[in-house]
């Protein structure tokens, strides 16, 4: 859970194959911690998915939900399926190029959801998955200043049935780029 909280306010930077720099501030994340997490499906359905999720910490991985790719950071020792899902970004650089990848009529819809941000950054899961989070083409920069507790909201997770009431969704309070998904409740930090 600590990594999920620490990613908030950081910058996700994408350098496209044609040299464009796209970046966004991480404004929403969710943690998943198998095997104790009832929402974690890695291993419940088939071994290939479990192996995909159980990579070394500090590497990118993609999970597909309803056919859409979701960007995650592996965060436990190799062999254990645990990750942080990046749910939303506030665009900082390259919004025009992001719109080329993901045309939208409302700018807020560009990166305010986990699949939306993958499409807006033009990410190819086959090219990025299992690469270190400090790869030149996609990397994370730590926040210049860690967020204060009063700047962070902790809620129940969204878009899942089991384990949704765990306090593992973190977002920057009042940020307009947070996904529109509504949790069932705001919770105390873990």
Swiss-Prot record:
Pfam families named among the record's database cross-references: Pur_DNA_glyco
GO molecular function: alkylbase DNA N-glycosylase activity; DNA binding
Entries under InterPro entries matching the protein: Formyl_transferase-like_C_sf, MPG, MPG_sf
Top-level taxon of origin: Bacteria
Top-rank EC class of the record's enzyme: hydrolase
Entry keywords, A to Z: DNA damage, DNA repair, Hydrolase
EC number: 3.2.2.-
Any one GO BP annotation for this protein: base-excision repair
Keyword Kinase: no
Keyword DNA damage: yes
NCBIfam families the record matches: 3mg
PANTHER family tied to this protein: DNA-3-METHYLADENINE GLYCOSYLASE
Similarity-based family: Belongs to the DNA glycosylase MPG family.
Protein name per the record: Putative 3-methyladenine DNA glycosylase
Organism: Deinococcus radiodurans (strain ATCC 13939 / DSM 20539 / JCM 16871 / CCUG 27074 / LMG 4051 / NBRC 15346 / NCIMB 9279 / VKM B-1422 / R1)
